[in-house]
């Protein structure tokens, strides 16, 4: 292993006289670094404000935002979309979904109870991805603070009202590939945006010509 060599930096010259102290003070206080810091401060002072005064102001949420779940209904009849298959309960990684069903007179499953323990839910969205009927989707209601645990997870809290379903007033789930609102304004430039493609004239000038191939073409 090579031996490392350390060099001692020269010491700063000591200032003794009052004139030299005054010159050193002016040099350090009125140097270029001070003006750089002041320029940055003034620039940010007059720049537009980006602060959101929550809760009076709120940012638009993306359609892919994962918050408290919504149980959807059919738009025409207003009936519940959930068929009680239990796929959401089986795929739930935090084991927070509980479905109790029974067979009705038509041998179809009827839902007795559908609960989601929001205290254990990690909002991964797997239940919404696996649902074959789009009955459970991820909503955008994130203000769900409460002092009692019993207020979380009841079916009536998640289920869309029948009147909203018949009036088609509730929004359908746009899917996990939906774009966010104002995505053009929020899109930032990448390094590839600053690369300029060569024009056609420049590309023609840069293409090398092989004289031997031209001679062969003339002989033919």
Curated annotation (Swiss-Prot):
It is found in: Cell inner membrane. One of its GO terms (molecular function) is quinone binding. The keyword 4Fe-4S applies. Disulfide bonds: none annotated. Residues 198-207 have a biased composition (Basic and acidic residues). It comes from the Bacteria. GO terms for biological process: aerobic respiration. Residues 187-220 are annotated as: Disordered. Binds 2 [4Fe-4S] clusters per subunit. NDH-1 shuttles electrons from NADH, via FMN and iron-sulfur (Fe-S) centers, to quinones in the respiratory chain. The immediate electron acceptor for the enzyme in this species is believed to be ubiquinone. Couples the redox reaction to proton translocation (for every two electrons transferred, four hydrogen ions are translocated across the cytoplasmic membrane), and thus conserves the redox energy in a proton gradient. Belongs to the complex I 23 kDa subunit family. NDH-1 is composed of 14 different subunits. Subunits NuoA, H, J, K, L, M, N constitute the membrane sector of the complex. This is NADH-quinone oxidoreductase subunit I. It comes from Helicobacter pylori (strain Shi470). The lineage of its organism: Bacteria, Pseudomonadati, Campylobacterota, Epsilonproteobacteria, Campylobacterales. The gene is nuoI.
